[in-house]
Regions:
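Auxiliary, metal-adjacent structural segments of Zn-dependent hydrolase domains
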Residues: 6-61
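Substrate-binding/catalytic groove segments of enzymes
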Residues: 89-100, 128-136
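Post-HEXXH active-site segment of zinc metalloproteases
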Residues: 75-79, 91-122
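Long, well-structured alpha-helical subdomains associated
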Residues: 111-113, 117, 122-159
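Short, solvent-exposed loop/turn segments at secondary-structure junctions
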Residues: 44-47, 71-73, 128
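Short, contiguous pre-domain boundary segments
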Residues: 2-8, 101-105
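Short pre-active-site segment immediately N-terminal to the catalytic Zn-binding motif
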Residues: 64-81
Length: 159
């Protein structure tokens, strides 16, 4: 359901494939969308220099998420993906129908769009990403503990 296109010079996807795939699989299972979406990783040096530059955006007509990766921490990139995936969920529900203005200030001018942004922040950044992060850390901690126990057993058996 999620296709990734890595058009970044840093090959952000290739160098972080396991974590990104884990996150997108988790999101696919936990978010309510029924249409495929594409995530495109792009570089933009000028945007990266702007302290209030664009980090990501969703194109509802193309069902495509663009993530700007230049100079960003992977955790921040994953948060952006999560936020934009909520916009994809909204699009699949039909919440974008009739929307025309997504220019500067749209979230302050349009009550419906403000609600959509609020949902994207709370459901995307707080719930989906945070739940993924906590579950991922818990599973990896359990795996490390199991490996330590296994090594201990092996050492005891070989002595």
């Amino acid at each position: 359901m999620i296709k990734i296109a890595d058009n970044s010079k840093e090959n952000i996807y290739s160098s972080n494939m396991e974590l990104i795939d884990n996150f997108t699989e988790y999101s696919s299972k936990n978010l309510d969308f029924d249409k495929p979406v594409e995530i495109d990783f792009l570089d933009n040096e000028d945007n990266a220099k702007n302290p209030l530059g664009t980090t990501a955006h969703y194109n509802p007509d193309e069902m495509k998420i663009t993530i700007y990766v230049t100079g960003r921490h992977l955790k921040d990139i994953l948060r952006s993906i999560s936020h934009e995936l909520i916009h994809h969920v909204q699009n699949c529900r039909g919440d974008f129908n009739g929307m025309e203005d997504t220019g500067l200030g749209y979230a302050q001018k349009d009550k419906h769009m403000r609600g959509m942004e609020q949902e994207a922040y709370t459901s995307g950044n707080i719930m989906n990403f945070r739940d993924f992060e906590d579950n991922y850390k818990k599973e990896n901690k359990q795996m490390k503990t199991s490996l330590k126990e296994l090594k201990k057993i092996i050492n005891e058996e070989t002595q």
